[in-house]
From Swiss-Prot:
Residues at which phosphate binds: L10, S43, G44, K204, N230
One Pfam family, short name: Hydrolase_3
A GO molecular function held by the record: phosphatase activity
Alphabetical UniProt keywords: Hydrolase, Magnesium, Metal-binding
Binding site for Mg(2+): D9, D11, D227
Needed cofactors: Mg(2+)
Primary enzyme class: hydrolase
The protein's name: Putative phosphatase MG265
Family from the record: Belongs to the HAD-like hydrolase superfamily. Cof family.
Key word RNA-binding present: no
Organism superkingdom: Bacteria
NCBIfam families, sorted: Cof-subfamily, HAD-SF-IIB
Record-annotated membrane-spanning stretches: none
Length: 278
């Protein structure tokens, strides 16, 4: 068996609907690590918000966060690569965000800033994890009233990703068309009600290349698990792309394998157990 590395998306893949990995899967992955297989994560989440998962499974490699815009090493507690959104294009994005009055999040190299019309702080806290898969991390997650966005000095921050969230899923294609008018950005739908905005050419495969170039990761000896449209490029970059059965049609179309069970029923565990037995 030439499998040496496994990379996991988090939301909808390694994590159950309760936002934690299932125990049976965790124990199996720890056994694989003991056998020399390296494990890490590739997520749309900020590295700040990946940390909770790393308490269940310690990654052997830096994690690919913000859809590839920031690769972070938990061992050294330092970023090893950052590709931020160019400050020149942020005003155009800001204009769109303010015009359409949708909740949005600035992911930076140090914090996450949320801007929302939800004035009930308790409601904001409860929906952070349920809606956008965000862990409640004190001091690193700043919730602001929507109007505060006018005062946000983006030039003082290294912005790796902007997450746009709408309550109306049917509005996503319309919002995507507005983003098409802005040059030098890339966007993808990581959830049916959200759009992730990054610098042009940034995606999870971009983050993967950082590991290939700096950490002796061979794509021909690598498996990737994912479930969403933002996994397509990294699926196309490795030998064994695996989509969860609960994944999007586009993710499954670009996968070599599809799990029998979903993320709430140890889909990863059952797939790997069968795959490694052959």
């Amino acid at each position: 068996m030439e499998l040496k590395n496994i990379i996991f998306d988090l939301d909808g893949t390694l994590l159950s609907s309760n936002q934690i990995p299932l125990e049976q899967t965790v124990e199996f992955l720890k056994d694989l690590q003991k056998k020399g297989i390296r494990i890490t994560f590739a997520s749309g989440r900020s590295h700040i918000l990946i940390r909770n998962t790393a308490t269940f499974i310690t990654p052997n490699l830096p994690v690919i966060s913000s859809n590839g815009a920031l690769v972070y090493d938990f061992a050294s507690e330092k970023p090893v690569h950052i590709k931020p959104i160019d400050n020149k294009v942020i005003p155009a994005i800001m204009q769109m965000l303010l015009e359409f009055q949708e909740t949005f999040y600035f992911y930076t190299d140090k914090k996450v800033f949320a801007f929302t019309h939800e004035l009930d702080s308790a409601k904001i806290l409860s929906t952070r994890s349920q809606i956008v898969g965000i862990d409640l991390i004190e001091n690193n997650y700043i919730v602001n009233k929507f109007e505060k966005a006018l005062d946000f000095d983006f030039k003082q921050h290294t912005i790796t990703k902007i997450l746009l969230v709408t309550k109306n899923r049917e509005k996503v294609p319309f919002l995507a068309k507005q983003l098409d008018q802005i040059q030098d950005i890339n966007y993808v739908s990581s959830m049916t009600f959200a759009l992730d905005i990054m610098q042009k050419d940034v995606n999870k495969a971009y983050g993967l290349k950082v590991l290939v170039d700096n950490y002796n990761l061979d794509p021909e000896k690598t498996m990737v698990f994912g479930d969403a449209d933002n996994d397509v490029e990294i699926f196309q970059s490795v030998k064994w792309p695996v989509a969860l059965v609960n994944g999007t049609d586009l993710a499954k179309k670009n996968a070599k394998f599809i799990t029998e069970y979903d993320n709430n029923h140890n889909g990863i565990y059952f797939f790997l157990k069968k795959f490694l037995a052959t």
